Regions:
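Single conserved hydrophobic/aromatic residue that forms the stacking wall/gate
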Residues: 1-12
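Class II aminoacyl-tRNA synthetase-like tRNA-binding/catalytic domains
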Residues: 15-269
Length: 271
């Protein structure tokens, strides 16, 4: 099956210029407007010469409508009959040019005028299936698989991306708050000759050129304090720390740590 999908890569494009995304289209919808979008094909319902499908991009999902005669205006109908119906698979990334319209039930939809295959999905997506009674099967819910294949989790579980977005906004807000207090963001060494700053067991590696052992950072405290000694009033760092210890759901050997230090203040001011 993977080999068959690889053979379908011949029509892939390296570059595709988009003009909008699904979220912007829905919020600023204007019937008849021309749009160029790209995203992953998540579902489709083929009914002869026409087909409704769902396209997912970084901002959400939108319905798209494929009509053979709209796409293939000449006598040659192979683009719809061969490329769309036979060569495209769920999970493929495609680029679409089309016009906006609403269906009879009011669904905001893109009428496809042209489309291109941008990237081939070599393996089928683990999409959930619903039977006639409404029972859902084959959901991608295994915690082990979700953690090890986060890219698949992001594709098939819509709420996961929100966690990434919230984390980014939280870090951005913390950074702005510290910068408003005139803290300087810095970077300190990850490979250190002496592990310090915390009572933890380090990961050990070896520097071949210098022929010395090095330790992956367990804390960035000591280097930040040296910068305060050097004359900075306030410093902070979002640091990756590594501790070669036990692990559970809340304790990972690799984690992100925020540390900040300031001169001429006490712990009451810090709190």
């Amino acid at each position: 099956h993977t080999q068959r999908r690889r053979q379908r890569q011949m029509c892939i494009r390296d570059r595709f210029k988009i003009s909008s995304n699904s979220k912007t289209i829905k919020s600023n919808f204007k019937e008849g407007s021309k749009v160029i979008v790209a995203g992953r094909l998540m579902s489709r319902r083929i009914q002869g010469n026409a087909s409704f499908a769902e396209l997912q991009d970084s901002s959400g999902r939108i319905q798209v409508y494929f009509n053979r005669d709209e796409i293939c205006t000449s006598e040659d109908k192979s683009k719809y009959n061969e490329l769309y119906k036979r060569l495209l698979d769920i999970g493929d990334i495609i680029g679409i040019e089309g016009e906006l319209f609403k269906t009879k039930v009011g669904e905001k939809t893109i009428m496809v005028k042209d489309f291109k295959l941008l990237s081939k999905s070599l393996k089928p997506l683990p999409l959930p299936k619903t039977d006639a009674e409404g029972n859902v099967y084959d959901e991608f819910t295994s915690p082990e698989l979700r953690y090890r294949q986060r890219y698949v989790d992001l594709i098939v579980n819509k709420n996961v991306k929100d966690t990434f977005i919230k984390r980014s906004k939280i870090i951005s807000s913390i950074r702005k708050s510290l910068e408003n207090e005139e803290f300087i963001e810095v970077e300190t060494p990850i490979l250190q000759p002496i592990p310090g700053g915390a009572a933890a067991k380090p990961f050990i590696t070896h520097h071949n050129s210098l022929n010395i052992p090095l330790y992956m950072r367990i804390a960035n405290e000591l280097y930040l304090k040296r910068l305060i000694v050097g004359g900075f009033n306030g410093v902070f760092e979002f640091a990756k720390d590594f501790r070669n210890e036990g692990m559970d759901r809340t304790h990972n050997p690799e984690f992100t740590n925020l540390e900040f230090y300031v001169a001429y203040k006490d712990y009451n001011w810090m709190m």
